[in-house]
Amino acid sequence: MSTFGYRRGLSKYESIDEDELLASLSAEELKELERELEDIEPDRNLPVGLRQKSLTEKTPTGTFSREALMAYWEKESQKLLEKERLGECGKVAEDKEESEEELIFTESNSEVSEEVYTEEEEEESQEEEEEEDSDEEERTIETAKGINGTVNYDSVNSDNSKPKIFKSQIENINLTNGSNGRNTESPAAIHPCGNPTVIEDALDKIKSNDPDTTEVNLNNIENITTQTLTRFAEALKDNTVVKTFSLANTHADDSAAMAIAEMLKVNEHITNVNVESNFITGKGILAIMRALQHNTVLTELRFHNQRHIMGSQVEMEIVKLLKENTTLLRLGYHFELPGPRMSMTSILTRNMDKQRQKRLQEQKQQEGYDGGPNLRTKVWQRGTPSSSPYVSPRHSPWSSPKLPKKVQTVRSRPLSPVATPPPPPPPPPPPPPSSQRLPPPPPPPPPPLPEKKLITRNIAEVIKQQESAQRALQNGQKKKKGKKVKKQPNSILKEIKNSLRSVQEKKMEDSSRPSTPQRSAHENLMEAIRGSSIKQLKRVEVPEALR
């Protein structure tokens, strides 16, 4: 009653005798009181899940027992299952012998007695023995059926039946992976992984060098042994047809990796090897990498997702061993360290670039064999007019009419070698060196075409002459502009100069990059027009070649 101490008006309950009240209660009322007290103050020793009031307890409405009903259902279901099993293969007698003699049928003439058990006489121990006996008999029947196709149960239960030991036959089934002549199961049932490859057939094809077998796929075959993988690697040493060898998720270890390494040293036809998701350690991977030093054919190698971690030392050793390799293009492994990862990326990029250059060189050689001597004439024809528009306008910026002549000659030159294969006649000898070019007032010499024909000139001297001539021209232009800017107002000539500015000059103003020494003929012409004036123009006779 201490729980009501927080309420008011408890004085009227102080005179009540609790013992008298409890004595006056009946048994049912006492049970209800106990339940109420359990709800108010549950037992702290009980777990939380058992402290609440049970709401599933109900009084039975008749002679019903739930436990007896559940036991009856279990027994009936077991009997139904046994009847179904026996109905498929016939009536099979139940043996009461020990578990050691379950798979052996004795030669004795004793008949197996069938006992019928009632529900009242069955006990738990006998039920367990009966279930074990029926399961083991079913296994023996299924194994015998898988080996011999059908089982004659009359001969099994006959008096003069010979002993049939199925253990050795079951072991033979496991060794041959279920491949029997009379077995009509599908390949998916033979290999639960879904790989339809038949191991023995594939090995025979590799040994016989079958031309149709270009890929050996052993992926996801779990029951393949390491000795079988070693046999595959040894058979591939002499094979010249197989290009791809993949054995991912086959539980391959270092011994299989060593065999693959020995195979790669000898075989010069396999281009793709996949050993992902296996039990290979760093020792086996390094053996394969050392074998690649003697292999110049393999282009793709995958060994990611191994059971053992490679480690930093193994990754660095892999990079060292692959530095000299020039044929590997794809490597299926994620390096943990950034240093080996970047080094391996650069190695693979280098190899791909070498392959690309090799391919381009082969294409050029094929074109050379097809073209023959005509290619030389084509190259000479292309090379002769290409150099003319870059040098001539710089030496003659003061005479505007000469520049269009050069442009016309440049435009008219490509037609001459096409019409007549021999080269054009040589022009007159060149003028004296840059002593006449330095002073700005006199016009420059005629177009320096003979200099282009000279083959023995030095590039450094030509560049120096161009730079000196350009500086002299710029100095002369600055002097003339300084004198004439005051006299000339804002005229139409300035607007023309601004409109004739090339795109390259606008880009050069934005950036601080120096101008390139070589420019096109159009830009040189525009520069000469902007730097010239009407007073500088002179009449020039048209040359005989253009009349």
Curated annotation (Swiss-Prot):
Localization (cell): Cytoplasm, Myofibril, Sarcomere; Cytoplasm, Myofibril; Cytoplasm, Myofibril, Sarcomere, M line; Cytoplasm, Cytoskeleton
Annotated effect of mutating residue 284 to R: Strongly impaired activity in promoting actin polymerization
Bias type Pro residues, positions: 419-449
Coiled coil: 16-41, 113-148
Bias type Acidic residues, positions: 95-104, 112-139
Listed PROSITE patterns: WH2 (PS51082)
Region of interest called Interaction with tropomyosin alpha, as start-end residue ranges on this chain: 1-47
SUPFAM superfamilies: RNI-like
Keywords: Actin-binding, Cardiomyopathy, Coiled coil, Cytoplasm, Cytoskeleton, Disease variant, Phosphoprotein
Domain of life, per lineage: Eukaryota
Basic residues: bias regions: 477-487
Modified residues (Phosphoserine): 11, 15, 24, 400
Pfam families listed in its UniProt record: Tropomodulin
Ranges annotated as biased composition (Polar residues): 149-160, 465-475
InterPro entries: LRR_dom_sf, TMOD, WH2_dom
Predominant cellular place of this UniProt entry's protein: cytoplasm
Region (Interaction with actin 3): 521-540
Gene3D superfamilies reported in the protein's UniProt record: Ribonuclease Inhibitor (3.80.10.10)
WH2 domain mapped to chain residues: 521-540
GO molecular function, one term: actin monomer binding
Region (Disordered): 91-162, 352-533
Region annotation (Interaction with actin 1) ranges: 1-161
Family: Belongs to the tropomodulin family.
Record-given protein name: Leiomodin-2
Organism name: Homo sapiens
